[in-house]
């Protein structure tokens, strides 16, 4: 079974590339971050983005969505587990704070 350490190492290996595009925070939350994963757990990734930078670097909002979906698929393919990506950019400060309490950022 996939471990928290394996996921965090992979996210760390992708950090520079993602940050160049416009991701400003990258982390793991949910059951894997809490060490409570089981055979049915998905991988929950939290990001924060500079939307203007991402559109500038990728060319259009559609290509930003495509890029993030491709990243989600690459994580899922690597670990053979479903992956959810949560972008906190437009969340309220309170919601971000609650999510951040359980997140492990790389």
What residue spans do the PLM features occupy?
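Catalytic core of pol beta-like nucleotidyltransferases
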Residues: 1-25, 33-39, 52-106
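Conserved histidines in hydrophobic membrane contexts and catalytic metal-binding motifs
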Residues: 28
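Short hydrophobic/aromatic beta-strand micro-patches
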Residues: 46-48
């Amino acid at each position: 079974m996939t471990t928290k350490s394996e996921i965090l190492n992979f996210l760390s290996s992708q950090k520079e590339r993602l940050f160049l595009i416009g991701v400003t925070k990258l982390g793991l939350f949910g059951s894997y971050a809490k060490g409570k994963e089981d055979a049915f757990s998905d991988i929950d990734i939290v990001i924060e983005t500079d939307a203007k930078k991402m559109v500038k670097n990728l060319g259009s909002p559609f290509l930003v969505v495509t890029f993030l979906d491709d990243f989600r698929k690459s994580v899922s393919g690597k670990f053979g587990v479903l992956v959810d990506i949560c972008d906190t950019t437009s969340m309220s400060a309170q919601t971000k704070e609650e999510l951040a309490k359980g997140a492990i950022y790389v």
